[in-house]
Amino acid sequence: MTVGRTEVTRGPTSLAEMARLSGEFAERHNLVYCVLWLTGELDIAAVREAWRGVCLSHDVLRRAYVSPDEACTYDDVLGEVEFYTADTDTEALKTVRQITTPFDLAGVGLSRIAIVQRDERRHLLAIVLDHIIVDEKTWNRLMADFGEFYERAIQGASAPDKVEKNAYHDFALLERHELSTAWGEERRAFWRSQTDRFGTFPPPFPIACEAKGESRLTAVHHALPADAKARVLDLAKRARATPFVTVASAVLASLQEVSGAPTVGATTPFHGRVLPGTADIAGLFVQMVPLQLTAGARRPLETVREVFSHTLDVFEYNLPLRSAGRLWNEELVSVDRQAGVSVTLDKRTMSFGESLLVGTKAEIVPLYVPGEVTWPRTLQFMWEMDGMAPRLSVYYNENYFPDEAVESLIQAAENFVLSTDS
């Protein structure tokens, strides 16, 4: 590994970095990775130059950590493109598996990129990042820049030698500063009130469950009518809400109906930038946020409106709650409890454009890395509306969640979305 000799500066970690460095997510490998075969003419020197350009353009790829509270940013890249050769596909994949291992947080550099050459026109490319430095928006930005720098490199252009600014470092400084101002006090008051009203994060499952052995993940896929997406969009439009809030409301309403609990909650990952000027900064900004529904018989339209009103505030005041609570000396999170229910709409995955690197065609290689999160005590609702065959997929541990309760929840959620009585 090559490490720049000169540190640009030391400064505070962001709250997201603080959470990861304090042991949050330690039970999983915490990797974001993409492995793919590239067919065509690949210029290895151009790949090296392109990745150097990406790292110089985004300082989050050049950060290392002194402690959970202190980071340092280098002015040069922290690692170069690794190059290997292999005689067989099996050997190439075995080589890649050696680099898809968890990062040492006390080390320098939380990104790896490697190329394994099978022949002159076929290469296996692996890009591995720790989740501390990347979310979906960041990944897309990094890959777009990678393709652009590669195209420039094959035309003879070099990556810039000097970094104009360190955007993520500046963001971490701003975030820590704002927490000590009225901006921070406003968020502290909001999350204190949320905790007083709904309890600590994350919301628990409202039905009593008992583990009956080792976790056994199962999936249930329910086909939805061809016009399901149109129905969701129509309900969202009439409620003046979003399609996501509409399907989330369906899940919350089903929890309330099946459990009989007056107040129910779920979680969802929110891909938001919480401070002005952070829209284009690369780094981890996504956080899990709570969704709540209180007591009261309502029609679907009223339910969606209530949930939407609550999510506006939750998204606005979104922060890494465990880190913020530690700084504020507030108990906002139950660290030993998993979310009872999570909800997503048309979940995206980390991808790599089919022809992102000019002159090559990419084919994704599904690769399982031990240590992936399994959520043994979280019921996962995934609404898939983008394809030709809309469906609701639910993933759960069948040795923890009762099958009958899960089926009842699915049916109630579907009825909510498809109901004409809104």
Place the predicted regions along the sequence by residue.
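Short amphipathic alpha-helices and their capping loops
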Residues: 1-25, 48-90, 109, 164-218
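A short, small/polar-residue-rich loop/turn motif at beta-strand boundaries
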Residues: 3-4, 40-56, 72-108, 227, ...
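Gly/Ser/Thr-rich phosphate-binding loops and adjoining beta-strand/alpha-helix segments
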Residues: 5-10, 27-46, 106-127, 209-273, ...
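Active-site-proximal acidic secondary-structure segment that organizes catalysis
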Residues: 5-6, 10-11, 86, 109-169, ...
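His-Asp-centered acyl/peptidyl-transfer active-site segments
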Residues: 6, 24-31, 48, 59-60, ...
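Generic structural signal for small/hydrophobic residues in well-ordered secondary structure
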Residues: 13-14, 47, 58, 113, ...
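Amphipathic alpha-helical regulatory segments at dimerization interfaces
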Residues: 49-57, 98-102, 132, 193, ...
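Extended, hydrophobic beta-loop-alpha segments that form or line the acyl/peptidyl-thioester binding
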Residues: 58, 62, 143, 262-269, ...
